[in-house]
C-alpha cells in the first residue's frame, strides 16, 4: 500500500475528490519552488506532481516549457530535484509525490541508480510521458519492483483496443488527459469528460484523475465531480512565471483545491 493508495482511501472515506497540483522543480529557482512545494499540503493539495525539467518537453505547452527552461537555466538538475524531495520529506511524511517528466534524464542517470535514489528520497510514483507500454521493461516494471507507482496517461484517442495495454501495468491512478494536444491549450468541459471517465472506470478499479485545461475553482469542481479528482498545472505555473509572491500562489492553489473538494 503506497502513500497514493492511502490518500485515495482516506478521500473516499471522507467523500471527497482528490486535488493534484503540478509545479516545475527549480522554477523560478530552487528556493522558491521548494517554498511553494512545502506550502502545497497546507493549501489543500492531496498529491503533488513535481515536474522534472527537460530540454525537449514535447507534451508540454508554452507555460510549462518555459518553466522548464527557467529551471534548467537556474541550474536545476535531476539530482537537485531529488534533493528537493528529501528536504520536503523532512517536514512531511504523508503527502504523496509523483515525479513527472521524460525518460531521457532518468536514462542518463541510470535506471537502477535513479530508482534507488527516488525511493530513498520519498518519491511515491512516476509519470513518464514518452515511455509507451511497449517499453515497460525499461522503467515501469523496475519502478514497480522498487515500490513506486507507475501512472499512465489515457487520452481521448486511446481507443478500446489500446486501453487494456495502457492499463496493464498502471498503478496508483490513471491520469486522463481531457483534451488532445499540449498542456494549457484549452478548457476542459465536464460534459465531454464524463463519458470518457466512465469508459475508463469500466476497465479499471484505479482512481481516474483528469488533467489539462483546468484553470479555475469552478472548473476544478466540475471536472472533479465527474472523476476521482483533478490536476491543475499550467494555471499554477503561470502564477510563478508572473513572479507572484509565494503566499499569493498558495492562496490561488487553496481556491482551486477548495473547488475540487466541493465536488
From Swiss-Prot:
CDD domains: Tryptophan_synthase_alpha. Its EC number is 4.2.1.20. One of its GO terms (cellular component) is cytosol. The active site is at 49 (proton acceptor), 60 (proton acceptor). The keyword Cell membrane does not apply. Pathway: Amino-acid biosynthesis; L-tryptophan biosynthesis; L-tryptophan from chorismate: step 5/5. It comes from the Bacteria. GO terms for molecular function: tryptophan synthase activity. InterPro entries: Aldolase_TIM, RibuloseP-bd_barrel, Trp_synthase_alpha_AS, Trp_synthase_suA. It holds the Pfam family Trp_syntA. It catalyses: (1S,2R)-1-C-(indol-3-yl)glycerol 3-phosphate + L-serine = D-glyceraldehyde 3-phosphate + L-tryptophan + H2O. The keyword Protein biosynthesis does not apply. Keywords: Amino-acid biosynthesis, Aromatic amino acid biosynthesis, Lyase, Tryptophan biosynthesis. The alpha subunit is responsible for the aldol cleavage of indoleglycerol phosphate to indole and glyceraldehyde 3-phosphate. Tetramer of two alpha and two beta chains. Belongs to the TrpA family. This is Tryptophan synthase alpha chain. It comes from Cereibacter sphaeroides (strain ATCC 17025 / ATH 2.4.3). The gene is trpA.
